[in-house]
Amino acid sequence: MNKRFNSEDKIILAIDGLDVSQAKLLLEKCPDIKWVKIGLELFVREGPRVIEILKGLNKKIFLDLKFHDIPNTMRAACFQVSKLGVDIISIHSSAGLKALKESKKASLEGAKSLGVKPPFVVGITVLTSFSLQDFQTDLDRNNSIEENVLRLAKLSFDAGLDGCVCSPWEVKMLRNIYKNNFELITPGIRLNIDSKDDQNRIMTPNEAIDNGASKLVIGRSISKAIDPNKALIEIFKSIESD
């Protein structure tokens, strides 16, 4: 079996829905987890201290707050967030080119002001909770999800962002366009034995990696498993072999 890459760099554990003590316990059970995603629920509940706690455990942090506002507000928010020492932050690509450019610029300025490494800034394209029917009913009846993802990914790339977030269904399409110069972070990952919960456009870890995903965001498949570390190891094995 040939190992294609360091699998620890490919998996981001989503700890949304957990409190700090539960998250720490889960990470103790899964010592090989390198990346952790903090979402809105946990950040609103615990505030920036949760970042300090996880950084104290030597974890890399994807702060997934999905900023979406006018350019000045997004700029100010990204300036402040970048000073927290996180590794990736997310913003909505649909905020527009000016807001995306301002956000990226502010993230560099905020990090520089404290002498910390600037975070990657990634653009959210179309949420994985949308099915095609729901998307066209609620948001855009004239264009497909793929057409919108293409447009929003290009907007992110043109703004100088470091990557985008898309479902595994669109990864191969985007990887063929952007090659290896653009991070493609992929939620909507489920094992064959899992229920899809509130996700619609889903794939297995190995399928998503084979399609060109840079990193996979995985939550319940690990956190809700009877043996979380065993589930993690199985995921590592599935994506490591060629």
Curated annotation (Swiss-Prot):
Pull one GO CC term from this UniProt entry. Answer: cytosol
What are the binding positions for substrate in this chain? 16, 37, 64-73, 128, 190, 199, 219-220
Gene3D superfamilies given for it? Aldolase class I
The entry lists its GO molecular-function terms as: orotidine-5'-phosphate decarboxylase activity
> Which SMART domains does the protein's record reference?
OMPdecase (SM00934)
Q: What is one GO biological process annotated to this record?
A: 'de novo' pyrimidine nucleobase biosynthetic process
Q: Which reaction does it catalyse?
A: orotidine 5'-phosphate + H(+) = UMP + CO2
Query: Which PROSITE patterns does the entry mention?
Result: OMPDECASE
**What pathway annotation does it carry?**
Pyrimidine metabolism; UMP biosynthesis via de novo pathway; UMP from orotate: step 2/2
Which SUPFAM superfamilies does UniProt cross-reference here?
Ribulose-phoshate binding barrel
**According to the UniProt entry, what is the EC number of this protein?**
4.1.1.23
Q: Which keywords are on file for this protein? A: Decarboxylase, Lyase, Pyrimidine biosynthesis
Q: Catalytic site residues?
A: 66
Q: Which family does the UniProt entry place this protein in? A: Belongs to the OMP decarboxylase family. Type 1 subfamily.
Known partners and oligomeric status: Homodimer.
Biological function: Catalyzes the decarboxylation of orotidine 5'-monophosphate (OMP) to uridine 5'-monophosphate (UMP).
Protein name listed in UniProt: Orotidine 5'-phosphate decarboxylase
Native species of this protein? Prochlorococcus marinus (strain MIT 9301)
Gene encoding this polypeptide? pyrF
